[in-house]
From Swiss-Prot:
Signal peptide: 1-26
Its biological purpose: Seed storage protein.
Protein's recorded name: Seed allergenic protein RA5
Disulfide bridge map: C42-C92, C56-C80, C64-C124, C81-C140, C94-C152
Organism: Oryza sativa subsp. japonica (Rice)
SUPFAM superfamilies hit by this protein: Bifunctional inhibitor/lipid-transfer protein/seed storage 2S albumin (SSF47699)
UniProt key word Thylakoid: no
Length: 160
């Protein structure tokens, strides 16, 4: 009798554990894709600076139009990579880059969303700017925990 109670208790515990794990995983899956969400502290002024990654802004703009001397570009790249690595929480890096992109759009008077082929500034299309920004973690060889080969998750979500 006691062994039946033990077996029943173990089975009940196993079922409850599986149900809890399934409910937790369902929160992070959407249409058979894992959805990576940044930590709640990944906000301007908390997980990264209010004006994030100023040297990365310059680098992304340079990459988009393909201009600049090699020496100047190398210094900007080093500075950008240092700033990106300084974002302590690796979960916050893509969020900081996304916020940086929004800042670039505001500075240029462009809407935050638009067609990838639309020109954001002379010689630079929105899609090219966003690809350059999203690939900064891979370019700088800094960790982002989304398993996307160093490319920020929101680029894959945007469809280009």
């Amino acid at each position: 009798m006691a062994s039946n109670k033990v077996v029943f208790s173990v089975l009940l515990l196993a079922v409850v554990s599986v149900l809890a794990a399934t409910a937790t995983m369902a929160e992070y899956h959407h249409q058979d894709q894992v959805v990576y969400t940044p930590a709640p502290l990944c906000q301007p002024g908390m997980g990264y600076p209010m004006y994030p990654l100023p040297r990365c802004r310059a680098l992304v703009k340079r990459q988009c139009v393909g201009r600049g001397t090699a020496a100047a570009a190398e210094q900007v790249r080093r500075d950008c990579c240092r700033q990106l690595a300084a974002v302590d929480d690796s979960w916050c890096r893509c969020e900081a880059i996304s916020h940086m992109l929004g800042g670039i759009y505001r500075e240029l008077g462009a809407p935050d969303v638009g067609h990838p082929m639309s020109e954001v500034f002379r010689g630079c299309r929105r899609g090219d700017l966003e690809r350059a920004a999203a690939s900064l973690p891979a370019f700088c060889n800094v960790d982002i925990p989304n398993g996307g080969g160093g490319v920020c998750y929101w680029l894959a979500r945007s469809g280009y």
